Amino acid sequence: YYDEKNLPKTAAVNVAEYIDHFEPWVRAGYEVIHINLGSSLSSAYQNCCIAAEELGQVHVIDSCSLSSGTGLLVRDAGEMIRQGMSADAIADVLRQRTEKCHASFILDTLTFLHAGGRCSSVAALGANVLKLKPCIEVNNADGSMKVGKKYRGSLDKVLVKYVKDQLAAHPDIDPSFIFITHSGIAAEYIHLVKEALKAEKDFAEIHVTTACCTISSHCGPNTLGILFETK
């Protein structure tokens, strides 16, 4: 992008691709639980539902989230599978649990959102000139995204303040697990966020993941978020 000003292109998985992916499992006698990118963010969910209706035995979950926000539900599903629950029962629980999953992230720059057509040039220029780093929050009721608090300052100070704000806003957070997810960021920032989390709450597990190429291409480097469940 820096050399040619071109971003990778992203596209939703189509119905035929979903059928090709699920059909071998269904034919083998399995029931499939598929946790999809939020329906407000992509047409992939609708395409998956069409494929599932044609195949049968595929339970499609609208995560109302993205990235490791869906990962939270995957962890929950895995635990319920280990407990021996049926696919129908697991799907029902997951659909009820989406509103307990919280996803947000800090953008270091709006340059990449602008390049992908997701914000105006005026907004991008203003944010970059003022050194604003917006917090993007995912609405866990429908998967839509909104701009939350706009932070100003160096990335290290912004990340610490962001962590404190997110945890303060969710006093009923589940302390057993939390994701730190980033699009490619220096290890020192990951360590900083880990220490900020530990200073605020005694998490049993802090798991660091890298965002997928789709998310990263829209957000750009140095994007970082924390993703967790509430009780």
Give each language-model segment a name.
Residues 1-17:
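N-terminal glycine-rich anion-binding loop in soluble enzyme alpha/beta folds
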Residues 8-9, 35, 180-181:
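Short, contiguous strand/loop micro-motifs
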